[in-house]
From Swiss-Prot:
It is found in: Plastid, Chloroplast thylakoid membrane. It holds the Pfam family Cytochrom_B_C. The chain crosses the membrane at residues 36-56, 95-115, 131-151. The keyword Chloroplast applies. GO terms for molecular function: electron transporter, transferring electrons within cytochrome b6/f complex of photosystem II activity; electron transporter, transferring electrons within the cyclic electron transport pathway of photosynthesis activity; oxidoreductase activity. Component of the cytochrome b6-f complex, which mediates electron transfer between photosystem II (PSII) and photosystem I (PSI), cyclic electron flow around PSI, and state transitions. GO terms for biological process: photosynthetic electron transport chain. This is Cytochrome b6-f complex subunit 4. Belongs to the cytochrome b family. PetD subfamily. Gene3D superfamilies: plastocyanin oxidoreductase, Single helix bin. The 4 large subunits of the cytochrome b6-f complex are cytochrome b6, subunit IV (17 kDa polypeptide, petD), cytochrome f and the Rieske protein, while the 4 small subunits are petG, petL, petM and petN. The complex functions as a dimer.
Length: 165
């Protein structure tokens, strides 16, 4: 490969550049030509070879074969629409369901304005954005899992029983 040059940390010029956050060109292995000419093509060709090999050796069907005379018992949307489907399925009023779906992007648009005071990038130092993300993720997973269950078990995920009056 290439020649790796060890840095001389006693060099005052290098120490001054390292103190300013510079000086990375003085040591290490160069990206050109080692990475760009030798490593990247091997990785790219290896990835292509693995994909072609898997496609040839184990071809998979795209979905089930179509049968126009057999309707499935329950028609479900694609997996990324499960939370929205669950909202529409459980909310009795359709207008309220549409308003709930519109409130999700509207709420996400307000988060930068709530967090505008905080300039940190670390999520542990941005509590509002982190809390909104965690609560949104839990609710989306809860609704997504509930959409795959029958309607009577969808809100509780079958974990506990709610007695209706």
């Amino acid at each position: 490969m290439g020649v790796t040059k060890k840095p001389d940390l006693n060099d005052p010029v290098l120490r001054a550049k390292l103190a300013k956050g510079m000086g990375h060109n003085y040591y290490g292995e160069p990206a050109w030509p080692n990475d760009l000419l030798y490593i990247f093509p091997v990785v790219i060709l290896g990835t292509i070879a693995c994909n072609v090999g898997l496609a040839v050796l184990e071809p998979s069907m795209i979905g089930e074969p179509a049968d126009p005379f057999a309707t499935p018992l329950e028609i479900l949307p694609e997996w990324y629409f499960f939370p929205v489907f669950q909202i529409l399925r459980t909310v009795p009023n359709k207008l309220l369901g549409v308003l709930l779906m519109v409130s999700v992007p509207a709420g996400l648009l307000t988060v930068p304005f709530l967090e505008n005071v905080n300039k940190f990038q670390n999520p542990f130092r941005r509590p509002v954005a982190t809390t909104v993300f965690l609560i949104g993720t839990v609710v989306a997973l809860w609704l997504g899992i509930g959409a795959t269950l029958p309607i009577d078990k969808s809100l509780t995920l079958g974990l506990f029983q709610i007695d209706s009056i």
